[in-house]
Every structure is written in structure tokens, then in C-alpha cells.
Amino acid sequence: MTDSRKNKRPRKSILRPVTGPNALHLSDIFRNETTGGMLMLAATVAALLWANLGHHSYHFFRELALGPLTIEQWAADGLLTVFFFIAGLELKREFVEGSLSRPADALVPIVAAVCGMVFPAGIYTLFNVLASDGHPAGWAIPMATDIAFALAVLAIVGAGLPQAVRAFLLTLAIADDLGSIIVIAVFFSTGLDIWWLAGAIACIGLWGVMQHFHVDNGWWYVPIFIVGWWCMLRSGVHATIAGVAFGLLTRTEEDVLDDPVDRWQHKVEPWSAGVVVPFFALMSAGVHVSGKTFLALWTHPISLGIVCGLILGKVIGITLGSCLTARFTSAELGRGVVWRDIIAVAVLAGIGFTVSMLMTDLSFPKNHEFADEAKASVLMASFLAAILGGAMLHHRGKSHAMRQTKHSHEVPVAAGTCND
């Protein structure tokens, strides 16, 4: 959020007023990036323990029907829509007044994000096309970067780093989210029902019209969101697309302090970070680790493609994309950022997790063995990326802090060069 917003006039709130300056609510704790990452990690550990110590009870709970969907489906197709609604709000803000609103500033991380999706998908496909027992259907699994987890790690280890490093990672992850949303919409929509889709579009359009006419009572939007989500689910298009669409059509106003995007994010983000994502992790990350699964992590094309895609593909794609953009355009890295910072961020971007888990369920909907193997690979790659990327960024932060203390400067890379 830009500093200019501090002087903007207030507007009537959508739901309730934001937390006062001298008050700390539980919801404020859940808005903290570190808290969200730790809850996700705790839910992942709990899922692994439950799946391996109580394998039958874990799968019984996941497959328990609750109305029209199983609990696992409620997590992936229902609750995760809230997470994508937050992603849509983030995208809207960035498009209007953030890093994606200034093409010159956004070009490097956007190209880096695209290359950081193409290279992992290419590496996975290469492993699985060349192998006789390969399964190319999982090509989309290593494409995503988990924005919540990556920013949580950066918040823990990023002391001393230039603010532009966080801005680069944020823009990269948001562009990555947009790419993942497009992939889900284009490649994982099945059995399209035009009438249900028309109903979803009508709800999304109604949301946009109400936003245009400044309808600020948030409770009017709740049934529209639910009906639009249900129509999207029944249409054959993945239901999370509805969340993104609602977020993108939410109004944001540069001259208003408490605009609708801020209000919705302020109210919904604690539920997303504190309930939705941890519960999705609990329902998705429960991999039964047998000797066969462990062996497959090091030998099977699915596992090799995912791990190499997230660890190597992200680094190669993001670094190469950034380098070529800086070399052949007038775009530059942020103030104080050097290429070693970009490489460290590229390693951290190998944290796939939330969207990679969703891609796994979409890629192998009927083969639990392949899905478990893929999820175990995502977990291992994400863990390695978090450790390696965190260590590298911590080292970079110390280097920046030492240079600042000595009143010396590490010269940023100028546009058109990529040799630092």
C-alpha cells in the first residue's frame, strides 16, 4: 500500500471499522505474514502425522460427505475460493495503484514470473515424456509459488534487505498467482455447462454493478458470493475462479483511505490465513509415507520432475527472465537490489505448496498413489526451497546491513546488464 493513502479521506466501512491503533485483536495476529506461514506449517505437520499414525481415520474424515461435497472437496473447491478471493483483491490493488500499475517497475518480475512457470513445467514434462513410466499430466504442479509461505519466510529472515526485494517477490508471486489462475481456468475445466456458467457470470456481473454504484453494505454481497461460487462449481469451471473474479471486480479508490478492497481484505484475510489455508493444508498434505513413496521421491519421473522443477526450474527461469529483461529493455531492478538477491528470491520461489497441492488434486483426481507421490514431492521441494532460500536471503540481509553500517554501497545493476 502506498504512503499517499495516509492522507486520503475516509469512507463508510463495508462491515465494521478496522482495528483501532491502540487495540490488538486476534484477527490482527492472523493478518501477520509470519503467523499465517506458521499455521500452514503446523497444519502440514499435523496432516502428515495424522495420515501416518491414523491412516484410515484420516481418509475416512476427508471422504466424509457433508451435504453435496466431501470434506476434502469443501476444502479444495469451497474454502479455497476465499483464498483466491484475497488473491483477486491483491491483484486489483496492484493493477490500480501498486507494482503492476507501472509497467516499467513491473516488467522484470512479471517476465521472471512467466519464465519461472514455463521452465518448471518444461523440466517436469521432459522428465515424464522421456521416461517410459512417466505421467506428463502433472506438468502444472511445479509452476506455482506459494505467496503466503514465501512472504512468511522472508519476514523471518529478511532483516537488512532492501524493501525492493520484498516488492520484487510480492510482484513475482502475484503475477505467478495470475498465471496459475489462467492455467486452472483453461486446462482444468471439464464438462462445461453453459447455463450454470451463465448464472455464475450473472452473479459476478451483479457484484460489479453493486460496486460501481457504491453499495457498501457487505452483507448484500455474501449471498451473491455463495450463489456465484455454487454456479461456478456446477458449471465445470473450477470454483476458485469465482473468488478471483469477485476480487478483481471489487472497487478500489485511490483518494479514499478505507476503500472496498482494503475493507474486504481486512475482514476476510484473517479467515483465509487462520482457517482456510491451514484447513486446506490439513486436508491435502496428509501423505502416507511408505517405503515405496520414499523410494519414488528419488527415482520416479513424477517426483523428479516436481522437485527439479521447483528447485532448479524456478531458479533458472526467474534468474534468466530477469536477466534478459534487464539486458534487452530499459527496465531495471529495484533500488539497492543486486543479482545475488534475485537468485536468492528465485530459490525461495520454489516453495509451491498451496496452489501446487491444488494442481496435484486436479492433475491426478482418480489416482491416489500418484497424488500422494506428487504431494510428498511438493512438500520436500518446498521444504528445501524454504531452507535454502531463507539461508541465502539471511546472508544477503547481513551483507546489506554491513554495507549500510560502513556507509558503503553495492552498486545496483544498471539496465542492460546482467553480469553481477
Curated annotation (Swiss-Prot):
The keyword Acyltransferase does not apply. GO terms for cellular component: plasma membrane. Its main location: membrane. The chain crosses the membrane at residues 34-54, 69-89, 107-127, 141-161, 168-190, 194-213, 271-291, 301-321, 342-362, 374-394. It catalyses: Na(+)(in) + 2 H(+)(out) = Na(+)(out) + 2 H(+)(in). The keyword DNA-binding does not apply. Keywords: Antiport, Cell membrane, Ion transport, Membrane, Sodium, Sodium transport, Transmembrane, Transmembrane helix, Transport. GO terms for molecular function: sodium:proton antiporter activity. It is found in: Cell membrane. It comes from the Bacteria. One of its GO terms (biological process) is regulation of pH. Belongs to the NhaA Na(+)/H(+) (TC 2.A.33) antiporter family. Na(+)/H(+) antiporter that extrudes sodium in exchange for external protons. This is Na(+)/H(+) antiporter NhaA.
